[in-house]
Amino acid sequence: VARAAAADGDLAGEVDWAGVGVLNAREAEPAEALRAGGAVSSEEGGSPELLLLLPFVSPVKLQAVRLEAPEAARAPKRVRLFANQRDLDMDDAAGGAAATQEWTELAWGPSAAGGGALAASLELNFLKFQNLGFLALYLAVEEEDGASVAVQGFRLSGRV
């Protein structure tokens, strides 16, 4: 059966949502919250980091990731992406393993969602995200900022 991404390149339909994991999340059902565009944040009093583990139904070609955050204080400052690395833990994702691509500063701007929400687009090195069956996203703010990290949605763009 031939598969195709949405006309606008949205790969949400290619994510195997039943297999999605979110490490260090405060919410009881973080995968469902992400799928519905709800906020997912790190545990209070813990380290301000999240690790999203996203399996795909079939291999995709990822071109861009768009993140949304509820407010500037909790928006990720550091993002590390890992292609096809299913065995990551938080220590690996934070720096113990080499990332496929990494950002240490994001350009956040107003989100279409409004209400103080922000959005940032990450353009990927397309050649590094071909034949992608699994994506891990590590999101963090600096520990000294004292805030938890939070995202309230993301969009994966590419091709099947």
Across the structure, where does each feature detected by a protein language model lie?
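Aromatic, loop-rich ligand-recognition surfaces of beta-strand-rich domains
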Residues: 38-94, 126-160
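Disordered, acidic Ser/Thr/Pro-rich linker "stalks" and the adjacent N-terminal cap
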Residues: 1-55
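Extended, solvent-exposed segments with strong compositional bias
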Residues: 93-127
